[in-house]
Amino acid sequence: MQPQLLLLLLLPLNFPVILTRELLCGGSPEPCANGGTCLRLSRGQGICQCAPGFLGETCQFPDPCRDTQLCKNGGSCQALLPTPPSSRSPTSPLTPHFSCTCPSGFTGDRCQTHLEELCPPSFCSNGGHCYVQASGRPQCSCEPGWTGEQCQLRDFCSANPCANGGVCLATYPQIQCRCPPGFEGHTCERDINECFLEPGPCPQGTSCHNTLGSYQCLCPVGQEGPQCKLRKGACPPGSCLNGGTCQLVPEGHSTFHLCLCPPGFTGLDCEMNPDDCVRHQCQNGATCLDGLDTYTCLCPKTWKGWDCSEDIDECEARGPPRCRNGGTCQNTAGSFHCVCVSGWGGAGCEENLDDCAAATCAPGSTCIDRVGSFSCLCPPGRTGLLCHLEDMCLSQPCHVNAQCSTNPLTGSTLCICQPGYSGSTCHQDLDECQMAQQGPSPCEHGGSCINTPGSFNCLCLPGYTGSRCEADHNECLSQPCHPGSTCLDLLATFHCLCPPGLEGRLCEVEVNECTSNPCLNQAACHDLLNGFQCLCLPGFTGARCEKDMDECSSTPCANGGRCRDQPGAFYCECLPGFEGPHCEKEVDECLSDPCPVGASCLDLPGAFFCLCRPGFTGQLCEVPLCTPNMCQPGQQCQGQEHRAPCLCPDGSPGCVPAEDNCPCHHGHCQRSLCVCDEGWTGPECETELGGCISTPCAHGGTCHPQPSGYNCTCPAGYMGLTCSEEVTACHSGPCLNGGSCSIRPEGYSCTCLPSHTGRHCQTAVDHCVSASCLNGGTCVNKPGTFFCLCATGFQGLHCEEKTNPSCADSPCRNKATCQDTPRGARCLCSPGYTGSSCQTLIDLCARKPCPHTARCLQSGPSFQCLCLQGWTGALCDFPLSCQKAAMSQGIEISGLCQNGGLCIDTGSSYFCRCPPGFQGKLCQDNVNPCEPNPCHHGSTCVPQPSGYVCQCAPGYEGQNCSKVLDACQSQPCHNHGTCTSRPGGFHCACPPGFVGLRCEGDVDECLDRPCHPSGTAACHSLANAFYCQCLPGHTGQRCEVEMDLCQSQPCSNGGSCEITTGPPPGFTCHCPKGFEGPTCSHKALSCGIHHCHNGGLCLPSPKPGSPPLCACLSGFGGPDCLTPPAPPGCGPPSPCLHNGTCTETPGLGNPGFQCTCPPDSPGPRCQRPGASGCEGRGGDGTCDAGCSGPGGDWDGGDCSLGVPDPWKGCPPHSQCWLLFRDGRCHPQCDSEECLFDGYDCEIPLTCIPAYDQYCRDHFHNGHCEKGCNNAECGWDGGDCRPEGEDSEGRPSLALLVVLRPPALDQQLLALARVLSLTLRVGLWVRKDSEGRNMVFPYPGTRAKEELSGARDSSSWERQAPPTQPLGKETESLGAGFVVVMGVDLSRCGPEHPASRCPWDSGLLLRFLAAMAAVGALEPLLPGPLLAAHPQAGTRPSANQLPWPILCSPVVGVLLLALGALLVLQLIRRRRREHGALWLPPGFIRRPQTQQAPHRRRPPLGEDNIGLKALKPEAEVDEDGVAMCSGPEEGEAEETASASRCQLWPLNSGCGELPQAAMLTPPQECESEVLDVDTCGPDGVTPLMSAVFCGGVQSTTGASPQRLGLGNLEPWEPLLDRGACPQAHTVGTGETPLHLAARFSRPTAARRLLEAGANPNQPDRAGRTPLHTAVAADAREVCQLLLASRQTTVDARTEDGTTPLMLAARLAVEDLVEELIAARADVGARDKRGKTALHWAAAVNNARAARSLLQAGADKDAQDSREQTPLFLAAREGAVEVAQLLLELGAARGLRDQAGLAPGDVARQRSHWDLLTLLEGAGPTTQEARAHARTTPGGGAAPRCRTLSAGARPRGGGACLQARTWSVDLGARGGKVYARCRSRSGSCGGPTTRGRRFSAGSRGRRGARASQDDWPRDWVALEACGSACSAPIPPPSLTPSPERGSPQVAWGLPVHQEIPLNSVVRNLN
């Protein structure tokens, strides 16, 4: 073989070679770029062998795969050459791209993403498998039984519970089936009988026949169709009425017709208009009006909407306000009602209530009616709220500076001393300096104290000032330093910090910077502050005049003059012809008369021109035209202009004139002279004058005449036709690519188009740097943009969408035929191509088609054979002649052509002439009728003997498959899709919600995440719909609506409901004392609410009065089973027994352990299998730990519930008894014989936390809860078993267990559930034939008599608990019970391999015994399990109970020991002497033992001994504050009510109580130490009651001395004995300091603060004592609290209210100023974003608003609704505040979130006076105030200051407003009833107020009140007294921030309030 051919065969195996027909080697330049080598082939063709790193036809492309880091994580890179579409411009840039083939475990366009990052191991829960979708999103494939995006939800639908095609919806706590039409029921199991529906489905005159899921109408003769609407025959004329259309319907061989009725008509002939009002949806009493196919609802005037369901808001209607006098209009369904402010009544608040009608002012006083109250105007000498007291201040007993008042309780003189005085009359001066000797000096910083009357003075050391020398004297206040400097205050001096440029002590010396002569070039220096200024001479510039100005830069020289710069000046070098300083003057060369006489001079720029007289020429006309010998003889030279012709004089004979043949270029010759045309001159008219005559060239340009005009030669710096354009930097066009050039002082700048950048716009912006083409797409940069060349199968701007190619997308390449298939487009490739898109060229030469060593050369989809010598033909398979061919093959010439063909020589070759029917080069082939292919559209041609047959592709038919089939005839589109026939198939346009080729796929609507994320548990896709499974507390189609869970009043027993925000949202019930639970439905200290998590079981506490306990499962621990299980291995606790040492060992999963045991404990866990001395101890009823093991038969069964060997049958060598329930799987023990290794090899079963509490609460309640009917949730206590299976024959299990009788039922449920969870079988307490639980007291020592069989089960009675506690714990107070439990083993056994659990009673008992043997059972049960026995009957007989445990002597010993303990406990109780202590009535004395931190245990067996039960001690909350306990569980409600809520008459004062009641009540043991913090009703301690009743003067003579208190206040001895000042009430959480503030007890408040009371302790609502003092207007208490450094002035309640906001809201003006003085934050905001100024504006508190504004409050502050104080003032009609705000420039245009401005809301509320004020023409302040008092709705009237009992109005004003108090009132039996609170009077409490009902009036919900409607602790109002021990009314701050002024009420908020005088009148 030739070397060249061998090289060509080897090249494709090693180098990237591209063949092209047009590439020729040896050309210039070389065709192969980038170092490629051109290899020549035959016929002049060539190929390029590219260097490494390049590819392409001519090696013109860089190989993108040369970067080895392009594909990450071991991915392989493959370069892809660009193939531009035919429509692309040939100039478009094309670059090769690449594709990465990723290894397993990676993905991404560069293999950069690890699949584990998208699918972390914990992404899918509950065994779900995570995979990555084509879109890149992770998706979970859930195990059966689980669903959700991460398999986190239990799939209740996995078992397909819905029948008959119902769709299962997973809802909590059970499934819901969405039934198809025709079925109903919980699981769609019932067929709907449509024939029973009203109206029936069939028309009248037909019979209805029900079918499964549907119905059939039996039509009369002549009618057909589903509705019998088809009638036989053609359409008769006029048969269809009311516009109906008759349509023929062929049915078989007959013709029917039916009427197609228009909307609104029905019937066979469309004769009926059905009544659409039959099923109307009109609501609220609307009238339905029938129409055509519709109806109209005629709504009442209070409703609107299409169905009259929208309530018309009468409160927002136009017109006068519904509620007058400041009343608040509240819209209701179909109406409205007015909530009137205090003092007004009536339906529209139009009635002013006369409070003086029932006033009780003392005789002689005048009653003044107020709004909502009254005041008494006292005569001289009388005082008090009712003028009932003698004015003790008339004699002026107090010091002149003291404030005198009369005590409203005692009537005595009360002197309030000024600071510095003391004593009862404030005449005693306090020596503050002497008092300082015992404590810190009042003068700070070493000042000397000098006492003065009522005060003191401080002599301060130098440098300090202030009344107490507390302030450093600020010497900088006098501004000693020079202006501009900073003064720094020091101790007794100051220091000036000088700015640059000043110096000196006071910075008064200015530094002269000109002294150093900084200015250059003789410039003048001007001194400045911290600088200087140089005044430069002309020609210089710069900060120091150091720069010489380039005067030539402005081109001052004109006319081409050259500028020469000089220091400070310049000069111009002018061109010839110009002069002047700037060459601005043109020189007139004619002034020197250069032309001779007779010639005229013409001045030109820089030159001159002589116009010669005739006969002369030359520059100076010095050349005569007539020269000697110029003319012929006889001729005479005639000198003319520019010429001198020779002329014959007249009359000269013999003179021959000259011929007219002179040469004129631009003229004509006349008499030998040239007459020039216009614009030309010269002897021969050769010079063009043009435009140069007018000197058009500017700036010294030279003019050159041209044939068509002129041409200017411009000097440097100018250009243009006339040199008029100045040359600039932009004239050279420096900005490329369309950039625009702009002149700048420094040169020029280019503004580039978006497609380019750079200084000259020379760089194209590569948009591919920031763009990202996904899925292997290649980015192609274009000017100003980019586009992505997407890989096959992707589309979009960034190739982000995956395509499903169809033939419409032209996916086939290389002239292939496209065919649509269900799976997408299919390409039928042309010969030579392959691949899904026919994109791959087949290597035809690889098949070696060229024989006889011919060279194969492929070009595109074809190839060519290069024949060797002697061969020819397309395949080089023919010799050059017939003879040579025959000789080469060794045959005859006649045999060369087969099948009778004839060989014929032609030229240098030959061919075979074939007979008919054969073809081929040698006639070797039969003629193929399929070539060329006669079948069209990609069909397959099959040869036949008689021709061919075309097998048509889908969608075509005909002999040659040329006819297109209508693929839509078969209606292939499902779900109402629209079919469109296409060549080769069809296309379905799917309706919304469906996808797929045939619209058969339902769109997963959940992919768009339609459900609200915060309220959705899971999204379920349905048929063309979706279903959002909402979390608790959410509802709505998308779970977007938060439910008002409190609307249904879920809280029982008087609990109050509060919405919680979540997530998820819910509600919280605040339970009254004695109740608890989510809905307050359980009594306290019970298992109804106690949450034991992680499957734990709640057990009643063995200690009465203690909270319940949790028995935890699955290794969890802690009080609530929240402590996670201990890690496997060595724990803790250690698995090794008997002091063995544990060592962790590695394992496949969790670590294991190995025990190093002492010699006497050789077991794997250091167990002692057998011990000496165990003989005779087995079976004695006592479990001996040393004998517990297989060696000792588990102590004869004593340690294993009487079963000698639970592991009987288990191979001994496996030692499975040592491995049982150790937390690790041991396969050798995972069998029935070895008790399944204690389920250690199973996945731990845990009830779903969301279901656990529900399943616990509904365990064995008689109702099947399917969600709880599984092993992990305890099989629902057997509630789901078939009925009737609790028969005598069902297996049972009899247990002997110790339980506690007080909570027996709860313990039985706990016992059954814990055994069900542990054993994985269903267990429940069986019932006998009478429905009673089969629980029997164990008779103990009477076993032999009672269990002998003499008595049957019917004679057994439920007895009281035994007299002695039975069991192992003496503290448990338990008794032995025989509990017979039913067992459901139906889900266990070999037939249920998935449920590994005991399948017979014997195996169940062995498993239970094994757990007891290893100690794993007792911690789970509510009491010790002593024995167990399988049973089948209802009552175990004596011989069936294998438990002699309690009959043994050991039990007797235990009982004797128990009795001894009881006696010792009674004997060892100590007695203590104590003195008398005042306690209020109703408080129960309790002994205070030494073990105060521990709860006392009641005497053991107190129920049997007969001791009086002790009340439980007060509990202590987390703050260490004593709380009061509720009644004992099981205590009667009447008893509890009588003891806890004692009612006292209101008509008796504190002093009227019996003396015995005022003294210490007799106790059970007088010698015991009294508990001074004992709790009374509502947790009120004696200290609280003392504060409440402080300062009482008995009207019956019971003085403090008679009470045994001496002159002390009642709280003094309590505090001296250690009473807790931090205790708080149960209901409101108020401390004694709260009560002191609430009832204005400054003395008590001072004493409590000295005793350490916390002034910042919040109550239940978050109010501190300062809040309470502000609300009660207790100024003295406020001053005490503000004086305390511990008080937080800006403390906040739960809604963010500060004391300052409260004071502004309640119009307590004086306290507003005092709080501001105490540095309260005037800018603080509550949770609604409102400031104190907002609240002052809302209630028209102008004085407070002015004080707040003066303190710096923001007048334009906006709250969370973007409402300003001016907005609230406009809304509430607060004219005075609005006037004040507008005077201070408040913004009128600020709008709220609804877009309303203050003027808009004033217009809405009809506040016309305010609207006028806001629009700029408002009245004066006085007019506005007067108008506000008289105009309804114009704003609230000025408020009187409110005073609490015990306070006196300051300033002597008579404007008093009685504090009102809430009292729950009702009517029963014609009387007024009230929940008694307290009133003002001798006890100092406030007067009650509340809501009054008359007999028979409506209650809260509109129902008629009856006696059963009222709580039993309500009494008649006239029976209420004022006992100080009555329950203190709880405070309730009920502001109305949106409408009107707030109200302060103490007690439960009520809808209507009565004034003080009404209550007082009833009391009298």
UniProtKB/Swiss-Prot annotation:
Matching CDD domains, A to Z? EGF_CA, JMTM_Notch4
- SMART domains recorded: ANK, EGF, EGF_CA, NL, NOD, NODP
Q: Which residues form the signal peptide?
A: 1-20
- InterPro entries from the UniProt entry: Ankyrin_rpt, Ankyrin_rpt-contain_sf, EGF-like_Ca-bd_dom, EGF-like_CS, EGF-like_dom, EGF-type_Asp/Asn_hydroxyl_site, EGF_Ca-bd_CS, Growth_fac_rcpt_cys_sf
Query: Which GO molecular function terms does the record list?
Result: calcium ion binding; Notch binding; signaling receptor activity
User: How does the record say this protein sits in the membrane?
Assistant: Single-pass type I membrane protein
What are the ANK repeat spans here? 1628-1657, 1661-1691, 1695-1724, 1728-1757, 1761-1790
UniProt lists the gene as Notch4
Where does the protein principally reside? membrane
Protein's organism? Mus musculus (Mouse)
Name the coiled-coil region(s).
none
Q: How does it assemble?
A: Heterodimer of a C-terminal fragment N(TM) and a N-terminal fragment N(EC) which are probably linked by disulfide bonds. Interacts with MAML1, MAML2 and MAML3 which act as transcriptional coactivators for NOTCH4.
Name this polypeptide is given: Neurogenic locus notch homolog protein 4
